[in-house]
């Protein structure tokens, strides 16, 4: 049994390159216009071990690692009204995904 706070990660929004850049894409995407690994509304539980949830995108996990560790070890985000959660995103500049990461009550 771990000692960290459990978290929930919710996939809030997926964007395409066109959503961000319009018709002036900096590169030509080779893959689908939206992330095909995650679905809007999908939820993942980060257990008290801190391991990446099964089925979660490794790229996004790397991007959320600081937020996850901060919340799991008791940190808060004072600049939010809800200091026990934060909006975060992956750094795929062509097909980004927005997340809500929140502490679960014990």
Regions from the PLM with identified roles:
Residues 2-6, 94-96:
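A general secondary-structure signal for short beta-strands and their flanking turns/coil
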Residues 8-24:
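Short, basic/aromatic beta-hairpin or loop at an interaction surface
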Residues 10-12, 47, 102-104:
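A structural detector for beta-sheet-dominated domains
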Residues 7, 44, 99:
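A broad, low-specificity signal marking well-ordered, structured residues that form hydrophobic/aromatic
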Residues 51-62:
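Short, Lys/Arg- and Gly-enriched loop/turn segments at beta-strand edges
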Residues 15-17, 50-52, 105:
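Residues that cap or initiate secondary-structure elements
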Residues 60-106:
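Short, compact, well-ordered microdomains
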Residues 22-50:
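Short, flexible N-terminal segments of the mature chain
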